[in-house]
Amino acid sequence: MKHINLSFAACGFLGIYHLGAASALCRHGKKLVKDVKAFAGASAGSLVASVLLTAPEKIEECNQFTYKFAEEIRRQSFGAVTPGYDFMARLRSGMESILPPSAHELAQNRLHVSITNAKTRENHLVSTFSSREDLIKVLLASSFVPIYAGLKLVEYKGQKWVDGGLTNALPILPVGRTVTISPFSGRLDISPQDKGQLDLYVNIAKQDIMLSLANLVRLNQALFPPSKRKMESLYQCGFDDTVKFLLKENWFE
């Protein structure tokens, strides 16, 4: 098999779609996953990429954490920006419980996390991690949407960083083929296929997304999580869209 990479797009709480995709890859694309050279992602996409690489057996645990996290946000008077609610602390607690002690070693030079320098607004892809805490900090930085996730920016190596999805929402690696995964309909390998829309696309932070009403709804759901039933449906969509891709590429097993 030629050089294959997997890249998961930034998408907030639509990351449940990515978990459905990851579950399908583990169940029906084992040979593909085994041969993947590198994993990449931004924001929620980087979180799922890190789990698929370092702790694939914990995908179901991630699902349950995501459902509970979303329920917490829905219960807040003003969602994630409710005064007194610590979005980043909750996210960190999930990472602490899911990522294994050796996560940084497993991720070394194989996980590429998109982050944005708060001062220069330049994008960086980080792929070296000196410790588990180092990895967690980079993942937190990649997921930090200013104001929404809090006011205190994430510090890493003496600089302040924010959400990688603001500058590169879907990292494409320079070597080999990068299989792209996104819960937004667009020019992607694995994504929903919106029907009956004008064939118009907009490039948002290096991700080609179709101009459609469904994508506008998804954008809202990324920051304001929908009901658990809808999130379960999004998970199933991620699973089903990935199965279609595996069948089409003759990687299904």
Swiss-Prot record:
<dbReference type="GO" id="GO:0047376">
    <property type="term" value="F:all-trans-retinyl-palmitate hydrolase, all-trans-retinol forming activity"/>
</dbReference>
<dbReference type="InterPro" id="IPR033562">
    <property type="entry name" value="PLPL"/>
</dbReference>
<dbReference type="GO" id="GO:0050253">
    <property type="term" value="F:retinyl-palmitate esterase activity"/>
</dbReference>
<dbReference type="InterPro" id="IPR033902">
    <property type="entry name" value="PNPLA4"/>
</dbReference>
<dbReference type="GO" id="GO:0016020">
    <property type="term" value="C:membrane"/>
</dbReference>
<keyword id="KW-1274">Primary mitochondrial disease</keyword>
<dbReference type="GO" id="GO:0004623">
    <property type="term" value="F:phospholipase A2 activity"/>
</dbReference>
<dbReference type="GO" id="GO:0051264">
    <property type="term" value="F:mono-olein transacylation activity"/>
</dbReference>
<keyword id="KW-0496">Mitochondrion</keyword>
<dbReference type="GO" id="GO:0005737">
    <property type="term" value="C:cytoplasm"/>
</dbReference>
<dbReference type="GO" id="GO:0019433">
    <property type="term" value="P:triglyceride catabolic process"/>
</dbReference>
<dbReference type="InterPro" id="IPR002641">
    <property type="entry name" value="PNPLA_dom"/>
</dbReference>
<feature type="domain" description="PNPLA">
    <location>
        <begin position="6"/>
        <end position="176"/>
    </location>
</feature>
<dbReference type="GO" id="GO:0005811">
    <property type="term" value="C:lipid droplet"/>
</dbReference>
<dbReference type="GO" id="GO:0051265">
    <property type="term" value="F:diolein transacylation activity"/>
</dbReference>
<dbReference type="GO" id="GO:0005739">
    <property type="term" value="C:mitochondrion"/>
</dbReference>
<dbReference type="InterPro" id="IPR016035">
    <property type="entry name" value="Acyl_Trfase/lysoPLipase"/>
</dbReference>
<feature type="active site" description="Proton acceptor">
    <location>
        <position position="163"/>
    </location>
</feature>
<dbReference type="Pfam" id="PF01734">
    <property type="entry name" value="Patatin"/>
</dbReference>
<dbReference type="GO" id="GO:0016411">
    <property type="term" value="F:acylglycerol O-acyltransferase activity"/>
</dbReference>
<comment type="function">
    <text>Has abundant triacylglycerol lipase activity. Transfers fatty acid from triglyceride to retinol, hydrolyzes retinylesters, and generates 1,3-diacylglycerol from triglycerides. Additionally possesses acylglycerol transacylase and phospholipase A2 activities.</text>
</comment>
<feature type="short sequence motif" description="DGA/G">
    <location>
        <begin position="163"/>
        <end position="165"/>
    </location>
</feature>
<keyword id="KW-0378">Hydrolase</keyword>
<keyword id="KW-0443">Lipid metabolism</keyword>
<protein>
    <recommendedName>
        <fullName>Patatin-like phospholipase domain-containing protein 4</fullName>
        <ecNumber>3.1.1.3</ecNumber>
        <ecNumber>3.1.1.4</ecNumber>
    </recommendedName>
</protein>
<feature type="active site" description="Nucleophile">
    <location>
        <position position="43"/>
    </location>
</feature>
<dbReference type="GO" id="GO:0004806">
    <property type="term" value="F:triacylglycerol lipase activity"/>
</dbReference>
<keyword id="KW-0442">Lipid degradation</keyword>
<dbReference type="GO" id="GO:0005829">
    <property type="term" value="C:cytosol"/>
</dbReference>
<feature type="short sequence motif" description="GXSXG">
    <location>
        <begin position="41"/>
        <end position="45"/>
    </location>
</feature>
<dbReference type="GO" id="GO:0055088">
    <property type="term" value="P:lipid homeostasis"/>
</dbReference>
